Amino acid sequence: MLEFEGRTIATDAQGYLMDSTAWSEALAPVLAEQEGIALTEPHWEVVRFVRNFYQEFNTSPAIRMLVKAMAQKYGEEKGNSRYLYKLFPKGPAKQATKIAGLPKPVKCI
């Protein structure tokens, strides 16, 4: 559970929101802080990207799909594991989807 703006938001044991509609951009920095991340514009770009990906495909992208999709949209400079791991050192797919209020990617351990 997470207290935010006077309401209780349900999370699973790993901190992922149980209901992605409870997410807001105001909540993202709180979720990021729990991951030890201070959101910068490059972080926001990835967070918004995974939210759009989820809305389009109804699934959270695992790392391979995230890298491939980011490369298609932003080019090789941002669509590579090294860049994404600099932003999300504990796992780009796991941390970005958590901060974006989405379910854990299916293929993430």
From Swiss-Prot:
One CC-aspect GO term: cytoplasm
Primary enzyme class: transferase
Active site feature: C108 (cysteine persulfide intermediate)
Pfam family, one: DsrC
Role description: Part of a sulfur-relay system required for 2-thiolation of 5-methylaminomethyl-2-thiouridine (mnm(5)s(2)U) at tRNA wobble positions. Could accept sulfur from TusD.
Family per similarity comment: Belongs to the DsrC/TusE family.
Name of this chain's protein: Sulfurtransferase TusE
